[in-house]
Design a protein with these regions (language model features):
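ATP-dependent small-molecule kinase phosphotransfer cores
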Residues: 33-83, 87-94, 118-119, 134
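P-loop (Walker A) phosphate-binding loop of NTP-binding proteins
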Residues: 10
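Walker A/P-loop
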Residues: 16
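Hydrophobic anchor at the beta1->P-loop junction of P-loop NTPases
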Residues: 7
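A glycine- and Lys/Arg-enriched "phosphate-lid" helix/loop adjacent to the NTP-binding pocket
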Residues: 96-141
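Post-Walker A helix-loop "phosphate-sensing" segment adjacent to the P-loop in P-loop NTPases
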Residues: 24-35
Length: 171
């Protein structure tokens, strides 16, 4: 297993924010799979979804994982929320490093994402978004838990507390 922390969880769980601080505290580099895809494809995640669809995006995610699994070491890697959904991807994640599920509750996620219009899966009226988040979490939570080596609940915690919990979990 590589010397990486791999952060998974639903959008708005804090993967990027926690990941950057964790990388800084541990002397590791930070990488974000969505950002890597944007750089490679030369278009935003939103644009990829709009132009080619979710299935195409998920294929790109899998291809990226295949590329980085044995070549990245010394990183904190923030993964797109849907990346662990494919069983094939979960196997790559395990090889990539210690998989940590940052688990936020539904109300926190909705609060954090209410003004974010860069999330292609959360377009629409507020009631529809709430129902969509609820439905997606029902499906994704068990998958995230199965994929994770450890689960860190992020609700009602400061970023520094979450980072400290991850580091303590390693000791």
């Amino acid at each position: 297993m590589a010397d990486n922390y791999v952060l998974i969880g639903y959008m708005g769980a804090g993967k990027t924010t926690v990941g950057k601080q964790l990388a800084s505290m541990c002397g590791k580099q930070f990488a974000d799979t969505d950002a890597m895809i944007v750089e490679k494809e030369k278009m935003s995640v939103n644009d990829i979804f709009a132009k080619y669809g979710e299935s195409y995006f998920r294929t790109i995610e899998t291809n990226l994982l295949k590329e980085i699994t044995d070549s990245m070491s010394g990183y904190v890697i923030s993964c797109g929320g849907g990346l662990p959904l494919k069983e094939e991807n979960r196997a790559y994640l395990k090889r990539l490093g210690k998989v940590i599920y940052l688990k936020a509750d539904e109300s926190d996620i909705i609060k954090r994402l209410k003004n974010d219009n860069t999330r292609p899966l959360l377009k629409g009226p507020k009631d529809e978004v709430r129902a969509k988040v609820h439905g997606m979490l029902e499906i994704r939570n068990p998958i995230y838990e199965e994929a994770a080596d450890s689960v860190i609940v992020t609700s009602d915690k400061k970023i520094s507390e979450i980072v400290a919990e991850i580091i303590k979990d390693e000791e």
